[in-house]
Amino acid sequence: MDDIIEILATVEIFKDLDREGLTRIAERCWRDRYNRRQTIFTVGDDSADVYFIKSGRVGITIFSESGKEISFRQQKAGEMFGEIAAIDRLRRSTSAVALTNLELFRLSDSDFLRIMRERPEISIRVMQRLAFLVRALSERIFEFTTYGVRNRIQAELLRLAKASGQRSETINIYPAPTHADIASQVSTHREAVTREFGHLASEGILEKRGRNLIIRNLARLEKMVNDVN
């Protein structure tokens, strides 16, 4: 139980809860484990549970009929996913896949909605999260309609840099995403990512060191993103 409470305390929507409030939620959670590449739910599923990540990473994706993967985002320990289906009671609009071995805590949609009704501060944080997702999707739509492949790859690197929370000109992203991960995020092929990474490395902007991806010149990367081509 203590490990559930510890993880719930790191989830953004529960930041205002005391230990008693967290304990009440923890008592309603189920523990799930998944192996790498195992599917948690798929587009069209009628499940509506909400998930909180204890350890590992989850990819939120859609697969086309031809099998091409379009990745929306990756989520890590302390984050939540699956809440949209819990709120609107419609079928899943995306798939969730374990990118690593994964441990989750699962809360039913009925318990999630009851908590939102009982705790207005949680409802407000859920709305703030949904607003964030809408803004992120709007940004993606702009990029796909305006940017070429190279700019989209650069924009994804910039997004990863900002998501790291580091406040310096040199950003260390760990673990480094694979070229295939980046490609699925920006709807291109792995070879295009490899070429662009090579170009950025030759310009002194990017460096791969073991499992670390180091952005050496954040300001220059941002300028390249804005120089649409």
Residue map of PLM features:
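Short phosphate-coordinating micro-motif centered on Lys-Gly-acidic
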Residues: I40-D45
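Cyclic-nucleotide recognition modules
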Residues: R73-R135
